[in-house]
């Protein structure tokens, strides 16, 4: 099958829009149930539902003229119009001992059930003829006329009689051809399928563009599956799952890929492993299946955790931010159970991303680098990415980002007169966090000079002069560099040597 860029992009947008619609539908249903419980006085049940779903009733409210009881009444009316009978919503349960407990449906079953349930619904925009229920005497008196009309329709349509309209609730009418068109079938007619596909793609993209205005993929707004439906009725596993669920990242770190200066190779590989397989699954099949594990290693302060925050911000996946204290227990056997529950919980909340900070701390030997990792674990980390110290261009961009020529923060104007190219060369060996610390210290130097005037002012009637900060120069920055040494310069050679032996990019 031939793939095009437009088709891949539209398919990805269609998938994202459908996932957002499904998520919004589930959330709206829970909010309607919570509103109904509060309206009917079931306060304890509503509080339990709010605690389990993490949906606060104070953050959302039901719109006007929308109510769960009203929706049920509308469904009953629609069902009666279509089938001439009211729907049967509930039924009497079996014996209490032999009654089967309902199992929670998975997301795939929910999607299939939703797609099957909407096949018989009329499309929006088409003319609909609603048939009112007719008494049985009408059919007895008019049976002969219906038989004659069916015979006439058979003769007009060439023997192909449509299904009776009253049986399916649809109005079927014949289409008469214009006098200028030929009645014979054109066997060699050419149909332009390419233009039809392009028109369909164009219409779908426009619909997605309109619907995407209301989409808010904020992690704090994401609906998390209930832990009570995890691993059946095993209470021990559910307790361990509750411990792991506390580390699901629900906040928005607000870190974009463009906010990370440098690290182009690391960002590209992380996108290939996490972002693109979800966005374009047609390209990641067979031998091109995405990588299951990534190892980000390098000196401290170079942006490894920042890459993880960008994944949590940009990707619409369940993000597990796991630390060593979460999966390490003093009780024998509990650590193994926690690791097992972690991966089973990740499958339960799929698609998921697990971020393990300081992975070497949970291995057999505690160390400070990737050399302490177990070889079996190293084999499962298919991509091993070195997050190295920033280059000269990256250091120069970082200094210009933190110390722009004019900074007006909280009404205090701070000016810079810096030679960014020279400072980029002088900061060789500094990590990203070191450069931020140096920039902060350089900006603090002119602020310290006004503290004496503020503290030594004792006269209440005499006004203080307007605060005016001195300009930060290149010499000020160089003096700060002389007193602030890099924290990880000695580790760069160690990581480079390990990269030469175990590199996999």
From Swiss-Prot:
This is Katanin p60 ATPase-containing subunit A-like 2. It is found in: Cytoplasm, Cytoskeleton; Cytoplasm; Cytoplasm, Cytoskeleton, Spindle; Cytoplasm, Cytoskeleton, Spindle pole. HAMAP family: Katanin_p60_AL2 (MF_03025). One of its GO terms (cellular component) is spindle pole. GO terms for molecular function: ATP binding; ATP hydrolysis activity; microtubule binding; microtubule severing ATPase activity. One of its GO terms (biological process) is microtubule severing. Belongs to the AAA ATPase family. Katanin p60 subunit A1 subfamily. A-like 2 sub-subfamily. Residues 25-57 form the LisH domain. The lineage of its organism: Eukaryota, Metazoa, Chordata, Craniata, Vertebrata. Residues 94-127, 140-167 are annotated as: Disordered. It holds the Pfam family LisH. Its main location: cytoplasm. PANTHER family: AAA DOMAIN-CONTAINING, KATANIN P60 ATPASE-CONTAINING SUBUNIT A-LIKE 2. Severs microtubules in vitro in an ATP-dependent manner. This activity may promote rapid reorganization of cellular microtubule arrays. It comes from Xenopus laevis (African clawed frog). It catalyses: n ATP + n H2O + a microtubule = n ADP + n phosphate + (n+1) alpha/beta tubulin heterodimers. InterPro entries: AAA+_ATPase (IPR003593), AAA_lid_3 (IPR041569), ATPase_AAA_core (IPR003959), Katanin_p60_AL2 (IPR027497), LisH (IPR006594), MT-severing_AAA_ATPase (IPR050304), P-loop_NTPase (IPR027417). It is an enzyme of class 5 (isomerase). Its EC number is 5.6.1.1. Residues 114-127, 155-164 have a biased composition (Polar residues). ATP binds at residues 298-305. Keywords: ATP-binding, Cytoplasm, Cytoskeleton, Isomerase, Microtubule, Nucleotide-binding.
């Amino acid at each position: 099958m031939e793939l095009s860029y437009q088709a891949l992009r539209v398919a990805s947008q269609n998938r994202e829009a459908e996932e957002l619609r499904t998520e919004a539908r589930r959330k709206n249903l829970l909010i309607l149930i919570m509103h109904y419980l509060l309206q009917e006085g079931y306060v304890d049940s509503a509080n339990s539902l709010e605690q389990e779903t993490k949906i606060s009733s104070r953050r959302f409210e039901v719109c006007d003229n929308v109510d769960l009881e009203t929706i049920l009444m509308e469904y009953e009316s629609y069902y009666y119009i279509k089938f001439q009978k009211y729907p049967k919503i509930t039924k009497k349960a079996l014996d209490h001992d032999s009654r089967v407990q309902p199992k929670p449906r998975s997301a795939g079953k929910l999607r299939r059930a939703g797609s099957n349930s909407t096949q018989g619904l009329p499309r929006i925009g088409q003319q609909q003829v609603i048939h009112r229920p007719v008494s049985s005497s009408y059919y007895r008196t008019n049976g002969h006329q219906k038989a004659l009309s069916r015979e006439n329709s058979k003769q007009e349509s060439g023997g192909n009689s449509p299904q009776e309209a009253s049986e399916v609730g649809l109005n079927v009418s014949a289409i008469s051809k214009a006098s200028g068109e030929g009645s014979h079938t054109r066997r060699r007619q050419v149909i332009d399928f390419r233009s039809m596909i392009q028109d369909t793609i164009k219409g779908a993209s426009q619909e997605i563009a309109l619907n995407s205005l209301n989409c808010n993929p904020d992690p704090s707004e994401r609906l998390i599956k209930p832990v009570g439906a995890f691993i059946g009725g095993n209470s021990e596993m559910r307790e361990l799952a509750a411990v792991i669920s506390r580390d699901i990242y629900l906040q928005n770190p607000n870190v974009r890929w463009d906010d990370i200066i440098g690290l182009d190779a690391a960002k590209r590989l992380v996108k290939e492993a996490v972002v693109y397989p979800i966005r374009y699954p047609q390209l990641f099949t067979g031998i091109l299946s995405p990588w299951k594990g990534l190892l980000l290693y390098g000196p401290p302060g170079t942006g490894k955790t920042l890459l993880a925050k960008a994944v949590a911000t940009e990707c619409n996946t369940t993000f597990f931010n796991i630390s060593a204290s979460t999966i390490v227990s003093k009780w024998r056997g509990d650590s193994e159970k926690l690791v097992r529950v972690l991966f089973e919980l990740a499958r339960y909340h799929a698609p998921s991303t697990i971020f393990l900070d300081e992975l070497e701390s949970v291995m057999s030997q505690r160390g400070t680098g990737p050399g302490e990792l177990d070889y079996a674990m190293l084999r499962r980390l298919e991509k091993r990415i070195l997050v190295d110290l920033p280059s000269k261009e990256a250091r120069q961009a970082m200094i210009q980002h933190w110390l722009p020529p004019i900074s007006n923060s909280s009404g205090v104007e701070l000016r810079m007169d810096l030679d960014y190219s020279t400072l980029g060369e002088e900061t060789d060996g500094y990590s990203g966090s070191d450069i931020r610390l140096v920039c902060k210290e350089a900006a603090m130097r002119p602020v310290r000079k006004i503290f004496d005037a503020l503290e030594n002012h004792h006269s209440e009637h005499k006004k203080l002069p307007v605060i005016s900060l001195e300009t930060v120069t290149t010499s000020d920055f160089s003096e700060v560099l002389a007193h602030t040494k890099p924290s990880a310069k000695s580790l760069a050679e160690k990581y480079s040597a390990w990269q030469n032996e175990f590199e996999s990019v």
